[in-house]
């Protein structure tokens, strides 16, 4: 599944970059995120509960910053496991705009879900994913714009 979008954030680009590269900050905005463990600057682990329709699963997700070009581009790769389900994702975030802001974030994600969770159907998964993505970016935007 492919997801993409653009978010306008009324904040300086370096502050947006710092927030987005801090797993604890981003994790605090992720629906269902229960814990974040920072292993080093490029590796972290999260536990998150995800529900789609009548199925819910608790994922353990390993994430890696695969590429970074501060303060413009970051590519993250993730692999998550839950009993009977798995998810793999690659996400790209590109920041643009004047240094003092506002900042435009273009993002995209390629996500593959397998196992029990995938059995509920792509349409239901996409609807849930779009809702969670929207909640995450609304939270990120609100926190950054609040200062």
Where are the regions that the model predicts?
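Intrinsic-disorder/low-complexity, polar/charged segments enriched in Ser/Thr/Lys/Arg/Asp/Glu/Gln
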Residues: 2-6, 43-45, 58-60, 73, ...
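Beta-strand/loop substructures that line and gate deep hydrophobic ligand-binding cavities in soluble
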Residues: 75-130
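Glycine-rich portal/gate segments that line the openings of hydrophobic small-molecule binding cavities
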Residues: 37-82, 135
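Long amphipathic alpha-helical segments used for membrane anchoring, targeting, substrate engagement
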Residues: 27, 123, 137-139
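Hydrophobic ligand-binding cavity/cleft-lining segments
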Residues: 1-49, 146
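Hydrophobic/aromatic beta-strand elements that line small-molecule binding cavities or substrate pockets
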Residues: 5-7, 33-34, 60-67, 89-97
């Amino acid at each position: 599944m492919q997801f993409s979008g653009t978010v306008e954030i009324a904040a300086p680009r370096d502050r947006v970059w710092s927030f987005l590269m801090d797993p604890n900050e981003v994790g605090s905005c992720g629906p269902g995120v229960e814990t974040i463990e920072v292993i080093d600057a490029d590796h972290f682990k999260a536990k998150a509960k995800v529900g789609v329709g009548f199925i819910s699963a608790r994922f353990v997700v390993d994430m890696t910053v695969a590429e970074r070009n501060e303060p413009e581009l970051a590519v993250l790769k993730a692999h998550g496991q839950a009993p009977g389900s798995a998810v793999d994702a690659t996400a790209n975030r590109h920041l643009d705009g004047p240094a003092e802001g506002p900042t435009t974030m273009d993002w995209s994600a390629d996500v593959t879900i397998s196992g029990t969770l995938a059995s509920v159907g792509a349409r239901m998964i996409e609807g849930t994913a779009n809702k969670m993505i929207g909640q995450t970016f609304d939270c990120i935007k609100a926190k950054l714009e609040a200062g």
